Every structure is written in structure tokens, then in C-alpha cells.
Amino acid sequence: MVSPLPLNKRQQGQVYEVMAEQYLQRHHLKPVERNFTCRSGEIDLIMRDKSCVVFVEVKFRKQNHFGSAAEAVNWRKQQKLKRAALLWLKKNSLSTEHTEFRFDVVAIQGPDQQIEWFTNTLVEG
């Protein structure tokens, strides 16, 4: 019997994005888009929470020796997410003045894949 090949980082990321999307759907968010990519970066998931557009960064850490999964979303990553989100809004003819939106992080941690959901996480400045 042949054992399955190990997943590369991209494939692993897709597995965790699906887990995060399903988790958010169980909490009544609706999927809009996955893996929006532009020059500024990538947004893992774009969801809707009623009338609010939610830009979601999904992070996984097997161990927390170098910080938790949530801590991996540093200021630089947040700025990339913000630029990508503003471009997505523009591409979808949505204005920042008339569209409610926020940035969430879904952190998947450890061998038991514990999920934590942090809402409205963007640090201004």
C-alpha cells in the first residue's frame, strides 16, 4: 500500500482555509471569495457577516515556540491585508464610506487543531 504524499505548504494552507471557512459558516458567516490575490498580497477568505464584509487571515501553527498563530499576523501583514482589502472593495464597486467591513483572524493551533477566532483585529497606524 502506498502512503499519501505529504502536502506542500500551499496545499496545507488550503486545508486550513477550508477548516476556517467551515468554522465561520457554522457561526453564520457567508462565504464570498477565497484567496483573493493582488500585488499588495492575498486575502485568505472574504466572508459576509450580515451586511459587513469580513476579510479573514487564516494562520496555523503546529507549535507555539515562536509565538501563537494569531501573533503571526504582525503590523506588516496587517498593512498588506488592508491594501488588498481596499483594492477588493474598489474592484467590487464598494466604497469604504458606505461599506461596513472588518478584519478577522482565524488561528488554528497545535496538533489538535484548536480554532480561535479573533474579530476586528486590524491595528491602525
UniProtKB/Swiss-Prot annotation:
Gene3D superfamilies: 3.40.1350.10. PANTHER family: UPF0102 PROTEIN YRAN. This is UPF0102 protein PBPRA3228. It comes from the Bacteria. Belongs to the UPF0102 family. NCBIfam families: PRK12497.1-3, YraN family protein. GO terms for molecular function: nucleic acid binding. HAMAP family: UPF0102. The lineage of its organism: Bacteria, Pseudomonadati, Pseudomonadota, Gammaproteobacteria, Vibrionales.
